[in-house]
């Protein structure tokens, strides 16, 4: 029985409810009156429920889809402005005891190069990332209680935060590790993490169990209920995501929104971020072996509908996607992207050679440098942001959501983005990127409505040019 407030996975992600939702969507996909009503509700910027959004996903009327696209772009601007936050993944270890059939880290893969970073390795990796200009990392590790215990993860976080190379610093560490206990989530909170990220992979229970035949991840309920334990452990910000291509996308989409609704209903705070990865080629993994792949157009539609359905959430697109695809979906509500990513263990300090046995989790589609990504964003009219101020100012969880839902984040995020971009331009940018970036900053400073904030931002931009760092509102 479906119950959004239940703490049992099979009740807040009800298979029966999803099937009824999909049937309802099919029955109403050409119901223009209902579709218009749903779009009008979306314009209120309060979101849509899983049934309403599923009707729009099933709809194939071109002009209605375009209305959704236009609305998604406007909602993103209303909540987040024209900023795009940049981050990089840092793979700590690819040792894993699970048998996930879509991931090359699976236990039975004997020809992947198994690696685990030492603390000395982490210093090299983080120094390389700081030399690019990164300020925000998402650490990743396989599930292995012997090689990757929570104590190892905590030590890595401490090391990462301690590294100050030249003007570099990692100011926010997000964590993407396997589902764990309330006690361990409490330890992660105490370590000062940003967002705890855990992809559901698939919400279809039978498919989930077949795709995860062995290892602790086989337990669907334990995995699906992880975010509740994380929030019980004091973690304010959590990030959801499914791996599109493992099961039918409309089922996954409904499940994803139901999970967001559950977090809001139980904890009063929905997901801080939603990621939309698609299965990609990797070592012994062929994505064509999974027959639920989605087209670029469907992918774009999903991105737009996540934005109108969960307007306050940060939406993340990684370098799994090509530059072409990222061009397509950036206007549809994306607020965070990775740049210059390496999905191999130790890949930043010592990139793997072509003839070397790989340790990558998946092939990276967007191979550009961080400077090239920043340059590209500026030319598209976006502000590349390295900001981590909300996390460090305590604007997390319900405090962040209250500001975001009232569209007040812009009052601090816009100047913060400009100041962190100025830091990047001074310390890391090529001459062309620096020139374009300074022109952008000059234009965007004029858009700050509050005269006092504008004046302070001008002063901080000047101070950054003089060598000072780390200002924030």
What are the functions of these language-model segments?
Residues 80-81, 85-121:
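Canonical Radical SAM [4Fe-4S] cluster-binding loop centered on the CxxxCxxC motif
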Residues 88, 126, 154-161, 185, ...:
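Generic structural signal for well-ordered alpha-helices
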Residues 141, 195, 200, 221-285, ...:
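Conserved C-terminal portion of the radical SAM core fold
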Residues 36, 40, 47-84:
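An N-cap/entry alpha-helix motif that binds or orients negatively charged groups
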Residues 211-217, 288-292, 359:
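Short glycine-enriched, charge-decorated loop/helix-capping segments at active-site entrances
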Residues 107-124, 128-231, 236-246, 268-275, ...:
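Core AdoMet radical
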Residues 1-37, 327-332, 341-473:
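Radical SAM enzyme core and accessory elements
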């Amino acid at each position: 029985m479906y119950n959004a407030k239940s703490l049992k996975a099979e009740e807040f992600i009800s298979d029966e409810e999803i099937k009824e939702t999909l049937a309802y969507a099919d029955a109403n996909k050409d119901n223009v009156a209902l579709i218009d009503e749903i779009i009008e509700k979306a314009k209120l910027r309060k979101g849509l429920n899983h049934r309403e959004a599923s009707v729009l996903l099933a709809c194939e009327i071109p002009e209605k889809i375009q209305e959704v696209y236009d609305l998604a772009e406007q909602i993103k601007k209303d909540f987040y402005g024209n900023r795009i936050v940049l981050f990089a993944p840092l793979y700590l270890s690819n040792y894993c005891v699970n048998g996930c059939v879509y991931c090359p880290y699976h236990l039975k893969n004997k020809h992947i190069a198994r690696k685990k970073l030492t603390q000395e390795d982490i210093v090299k990796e983080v120094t390389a990332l700081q030399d690019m200009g990164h300020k925000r990392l998402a650490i990743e590790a396989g599930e292995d209680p012997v090689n990757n215990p929570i104590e190892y993860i905590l030590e890595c976080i401490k090391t990462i935060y301690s590294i100050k190379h030249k003007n570099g610093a990692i100011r926010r560490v997000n964590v993407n590790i396997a589902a764990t206990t309330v006690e361990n989530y409490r330890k992660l909170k105490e370590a000062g993490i940003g967002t705890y990220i855990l992809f559901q992979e698939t919400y279809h229970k039978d498919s989930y169990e077949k795709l995860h035949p062995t290892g602790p991840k086989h337990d669907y309920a334990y995995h699906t209920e992880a975010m509740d334990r994380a929030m019980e452990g004091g973690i304010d910000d959590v990030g959801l995501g499914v791996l599109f291509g493992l099961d039918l996308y409309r089922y996954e989409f409904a499940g994803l929104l139901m999970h967001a609704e559950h977090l809001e209903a139980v904890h009063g705070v929905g997901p801080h971020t939603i990621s939309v990865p698609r299965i990609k080629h990797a070592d012994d993994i062929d994505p064509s072996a999974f027959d639920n792949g989605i087209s670029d157009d469907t992918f774009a539609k999903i991105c737009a509908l996540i934005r109108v359905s969960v307007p306050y959430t940060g939406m993340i697109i990684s370098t799994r996607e090509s530059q072409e695809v990222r061009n397509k979906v950036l206007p549809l509500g994306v607020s965070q992207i990775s740049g210059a990513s390496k999905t191999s263990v130790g890949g930043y300090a010592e990139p793997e050679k072509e003839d070397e046995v790989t340790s990558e989790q998946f092939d990276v589609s967007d191979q550009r440098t961080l400077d090239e990504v920043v340059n590209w964003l500026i030319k598209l009219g976006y502000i590349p942001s390295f900001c981590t101020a909300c996390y460090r100012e305590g604007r997390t969880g319900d405090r962040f959501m209250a500001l975001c839902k009232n569209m007040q984040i812009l009052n601090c995020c816009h100047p913060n983005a400009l100041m962190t971009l100025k830091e990047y331009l001074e310390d890391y940018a090529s001459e062309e990127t620096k020139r374009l970036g300074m022109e952008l900053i000059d234009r965007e400073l004029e858009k700050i409505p509050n005269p006092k904030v504008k004046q302070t931002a001008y002063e901080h931009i000047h101070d950054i040019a003089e060598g000072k760092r780390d200002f924030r509102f």
